[in-house]
């Protein structure tokens, strides 16, 4: 069983020194979170200051939580909704024209439950272009969601999903192809 007295964060795991990490958390809790909804460019600017790769015309709400922005890539015209949590222990990439709806949680980190010291690990998440994750979707570490895929509200994604499909459920399963109407 686990003995947390032996737990430690691996050297370099955060991708930034302690000062950078603490400074980001202070900025996120204040001038990022307190900014008016319409100041998308301001929040994109702050994220870029901390090393995020942010495309043009990104919509990111002030209530979004990002653990380490230097591990985040947002493509052009990506939208990230209210109360989304981007747990960037590992890299998160969200493709152009993709929507991550409110209260969704993208989780790149976990612990080894078999390890006595509860070893922490991180695996990247990739959301393709033109995807839509509806409200309150959970995405597990290591998942890739193919271009054009829709994941229904309150779904949990534990395995990678192919391109151009509609999925839902816990665990999320493909229910049909996504066909463009225009």
Question: Each PLM stretch: what is its role?
Answer:
Residues 163, 168-171:
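Acidic, glycine-centered active-site loop in nucleotide-sugar glycosyltransferases
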Residues 135-159:
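Beta-rich strand-turn-strand
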Residues 35-44, 61-74, 79-144, 170-171, ...:
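Flexible, glycine/small-residue-enriched loop-and-beta-strand segment within the central core
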Residues 13-17, 111-122, 149, 164:
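A short, terminal or domain-edge coil/loop segment
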Residues 1-52, 56, 97, 130, ...:
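Terminal amphipathic alpha-helical/low-complexity segments used for targeting or macromolecular assembly
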